[in-house]
Amino acid sequence: AIVSLVKSDQICIGYHANNSTEQVDTIMEKNVTVTHAQDILEKTHNGKLCDLDGVKPLILRDCSVAGWLLGNPMCDEFINVPEWSYIVEKASPANDLCYPGDFNDYEELKHLLSGINHFDKIHIIPKSSWSNHEASSWVSSACPYQGKSSFFRNVVWLIKKNSSYPTIKRSYDNTNQEDLLVLWGIHHPNDAAEQTRFYQNPTTYIGVGTSTLNQRLVPKIATTSKVDGQSGRMEFFWTILKPNDAINFESNGNFIAPEYAYKIVKKGDSAIMKSELEYGNCNTKCQTPMGAINSSMPFHNIHPLTIGECPKYVKSNRLVLATGLRNSPQRERRRKKRGLFGAIAGFIEGGWQGMVDGWYGYHHSNEQGSGYAADKESTQKAIDGVTNKVNSIIDKMNTQFEAVGREFNNLERRIENLNKKMEDGFLDVWTYNAELLVLMENERTLDFHDSNVKNLYDKVRLQLRDNAKELGNGCFEFYHKCDNECMESVRNGTYDYPQYSEEARLKREEISGVKLESIGTYQILSIYSTVASSLALAIMVAGLSLWMCSNGSLQCRIC
């Protein structure tokens, strides 16, 4: 029988592929190439200090917070400052306490400033009101200004006048509606001679009282090493005076009195950031000591300290979410050898770069030609699902998260070390959670795409039933003619199985008959070949025996 081989119509289920080299990690695999991916780790910054939501930072340049608040004469540019979004202080500012000494509860004051956005400096005790004490001429070479000795602008160093230091009793009532930051100090002389030279009285004290504060200070007269030419020391203190409260001062010497105080006119999220950067005339929603971040990503690895609406800091170097499919384009040689097919679900070997308008779809071939068609419905559902998942992750993580530095004094080093260990532990947990989240979501996304391809395959299989043959590679070979209209009905789910079932049945029987005829022919040929081979072997054996008998090599006896 002569059998003519005619190529049958086919439809294949496949998925999109492209030239992407994006790679992601999953729970089970590393470096999986995918068609589309989204980086969720911000790694870049602009290297500048920027406005935060349109409000400028207070950049103290070479001044410290203490130098600014007390009025170091080298910090005159900050005598009156507008509203700020955050405060920038260098790690070791040159203009700190110009007169050597200490600022009591300095770290606590800085913490207080992290909730303030604006001060109004107001006069509370004018320098001219100290008529019984020397208040105007006492300066120090430790606080130079334009080559001359000077002193802090916002406090007054009171010295004896006419060999007398009368006891001071002075009050200030806070009649404002806002809290008031008040600063004062005490001078610790080098020796007893300096004590009487400045204050006349050998034994002195300073008393300070409010509704919440009861303080009594006495000078510590001791010889110390010279710093900036000074053997004496100054110690400064502060308090918050509530509205309708009063602060009372009493002293008979060594008193550094407040002249100005700071009215806290606006509270809000702020921070004191340690940075050496310059102002960049820019705007941002997130600032770090390294520079500003303008990103909608949920994580960053730039610096653990931030201010504003910032991504969460993690120690990771790479966090990439898969949004597309596994990317394994078919090789051209395979396409020529085995036809166009693809998918993911275990039996489909590669993606289609020719299908560009969807993630999943079909390739058909019939007498009218061949072509790709994306399955728009399943693709759109998949896009919506993946997009919603990515947006949900970003929304949950990309909330305002400020991580400002905390400062501790020398007596709190153990607390500081413990705090650092706790913060490092939190960062490790955040990093682990972020990396695990990405691995799990990538695994789910790729499984999601696998499932969608499998569902599309099953949709076609259930329609065609025995009207087509599964080829095992994502393709179906029709037992009937399937023109373009027929192909479209398969794709849109309206395939009419009964319409083609009779033609398909005849085709199946025809194929089965050809197989049976072929099997019978092969059996006859096999028997003929066996018999012929046996006869040929018998003739050869008989001929050999006669030849051996004729030359005496074999004796033949006939009985």
Curated annotation (Swiss-Prot):
Glycan attachment sites: N18, N19, N31, N162, N294, N492
Disulfide bonds: C12-C475, C50-C282, C63-C75, C98-C143, C286-C310, C482-C486
Membrane topology term: Single-pass type I membrane protein
GO cellular component: host cell plasma membrane; membrane; viral envelope; virion membrane
Assigned keywords, A-Z: Clathrin- and caveolin-independent endocytosis of virus by host, Clathrin-mediated endocytosis of virus by host, Disulfide bond, Fusion of virus membrane with host endosomal membrane, Fusion of virus membrane with host membrane, Glycoprotein, Hemagglutinin, Host cell membrane, Host membrane, Host-virus interaction, Lipoprotein, Membrane, Palmitate, Transmembrane, Transmembrane helix, Viral attachment to host cell, Viral envelope protein, Viral penetration into host cytoplasm, Virion, Virus endocytosis by host, Virus entry into host cell
GO function terms (MF aspect): host cell surface receptor binding
Extracellular face of the membrane: 1-523
Membrane-crossing segments per the record: 524-544
Modification note: Palmitoylated. In natural infection, inactive HA is matured into HA1 and HA2 outside the cell by one or more trypsin-like, arginine-specific endoprotease secreted by the bronchial epithelial cells. One identified protease that may be involved in this process is secreted in lungs by club cells.
Cellular compartments annotated: Virion membrane; Host apical cell membrane
Side Cytoplasmic, residues: 545-559
Site feature Cleavage, where: R338, G339
Lipidation (S-palmitoyl cysteine): C549, C556, C559
GO biological process: clathrin-dependent endocytosis of virus by host cell; fusion of virus membrane with host endosome membrane; fusion of virus membrane with host plasma membrane; virion attachment to host cell
Protein task: Binds to sialic acid-containing receptors on the cell surface, bringing about the attachment of the virus particle to the cell. This attachment induces virion internalization either through clathrin-dependent endocytosis or through clathrin- and caveolin-independent pathway. Plays a major role in the determination of host range restriction and virulence. Class I viral fusion protein. Responsible for penetration of the virus into the cell cytoplasm by mediating the fusion of the membrane of the endocytosed virus particle with the endosomal membrane.
Family: Belongs to the influenza viruses hemagglutinin family.
HAMAP family noted in UniProt: INFV_HEMA
Note from the entry: Major glycoprotein, comprises over 80% of the envelope proteins present in virus particle. The extent of infection into host organism is determined by HA. Influenza viruses bud from the apical surface of polarized epithelial cells (e.g. bronchial epithelial cells) into lumen of lungs and are therefore usually pneumotropic. The reason is that HA is cleaved by tryptase clara which is restricted to lungs. However, HAs of H5 and H7 pantropic avian viruses subtypes can be cleaved by furin and subtilisin-type enzymes, allowing the virus to grow in other organs than lungs.
Self-association and partners: Homotrimer of disulfide-linked HA1-HA2.
Protein name as catalogued: Hemagglutinin
Native source organism of the sequence: Influenza A virus (strain A/Chicken/Hong Kong/YU22/2002 H5N1 genotype Z)
